[in-house]
Amino acid sequence: MREETAEQPAPLRSGLTTGSCATATSLAAARLLLSGQISDAVEIVLPKGKQVQMRLEFCRLVDNFAEAGTLKDAGDDPDVTHGALVFARVRLEMAPGVRFVAGAGVGSVTRPGLVLAVGEPAINPVPRRMMTEHLLQLAEELGYSGGFEVTIGVEGGEALALKTMNPRLGILGGLSILGTSGIVRPFSCAAYIASIHQGIDVATTNGYRHIAACTGNASEDTMRRVYNIPDIALIEMGDFVGAVLKHLRKVPVDKLSLCGGFGKISKLAAGHMDLHSRHSSIDLPQLALWAADTGADADLQQRIRDANTSQQALAMCATAGVPLGDEVCRHALAFARSVVPAQVQVEVFAIDRQGGIVGQAGVALSKEHT
């Protein structure tokens, strides 16, 4: 009998950023204006020198401008913009250089703290540089000495932006045109971590010295209930608590509140900075040891080790009057304090699935908030 072999998973496919889409479409539109050449595909050079060809959905003259569009292909990454139509409209200007405008579906910056000034279209520096380099090279090749007005838009971008961090960052009216390498890596954490850093930067630049970093919607609701904290000071960290703690070394605040589900906080207590199940797991034997430190007898400790979930362990401790939630938060607090600067006051909240506080540490509040 032939021995069975496990089927190897197909490699995940990379995609291209909205910045690459904007570069390709602006180049095609400018070429049409300057040479009359209508393209159905265009080749661009990414920041690290790789050449890629991108297919266009359209490339046409309209009155005194040209426009081109392409469908964003994020590869196998679950990107909110995958399949969206990214388009550029280019007009020629007398003055040399490139001027950027936010079109329909692209946001504008309304708060200080980002790399772009207030009032600027949300087209990030690397995409701006990519477009500028391609357009100036085209102008040189064709002997054109004037400049370009480049309007970038994303069809349906205003609605898509509501699924991103843009509204909280003060980027209103649509999406951001992003990318540092020009390539979307499947399931890369880089973009999410960047949004966490931006959230902290925006909050501190706008004068907020107390921020609350939360793992999800329920923990955000808890922080609103406890502190009436505004959205600008709520940092949606998801599983990336390490991104918050490490960034505070560069941008310290006066006070940091960490809030998450009990299971997530127990991982932080064990020293994990990525709380996703792919990278860290709940240590039930460790929970049993912490329960012992707060009065759990041998039988309860064994039942914790044998529990199916951390929530089950927490419930057993609650029945026995053992404050496991507070003990876990104390260990999470100690770990967080070991990462951030000493001047940052840290507190930790653990919540249940209903948003009730089941543990807290470093908190100058009474239990009335639970």
From Swiss-Prot:
<keyword id="KW-0169">Cobalamin biosynthesis</keyword>
<dbReference type="GO" id="GO:0032259">
    <property type="term" value="P:methylation"/>
</dbReference>
<dbReference type="GO" id="GO:0019251">
    <property type="term" value="P:anaerobic cobalamin biosynthetic process"/>
</dbReference>
<comment type="pathway">
    <text>Cofactor biosynthesis; adenosylcobalamin biosynthesis; cob(II)yrinate a,c-diamide from sirohydrochlorin (anaerobic route): step 6/10.</text>
</comment>
<comment type="similarity">
    <text>Belongs to the CbiD family.</text>
</comment>
<dbReference type="InterPro" id="IPR036074">
    <property type="entry name" value="CbiD_sf"/>
</dbReference>
<keyword id="KW-0949">S-adenosyl-L-methionine</keyword>
<dbReference type="GO" id="GO:0043780">
    <property type="term" value="F:cobalt-precorrin-5B C1-methyltransferase activity"/>
</dbReference>
<keyword id="KW-0808">Transferase</keyword>
<protein>
    <recommendedName>
        <fullName>Cobalt-precorrin-5B C(1)-methyltransferase</fullName>
        <ecNumber>2.1.1.195</ecNumber>
    </recommendedName>
</protein>
<keyword id="KW-0489">Methyltransferase</keyword>
<dbReference type="Pfam" id="PF01888">
    <property type="entry name" value="CbiD"/>
</dbReference>
<dbReference type="InterPro" id="IPR002748">
    <property type="entry name" value="CbiD"/>
</dbReference>
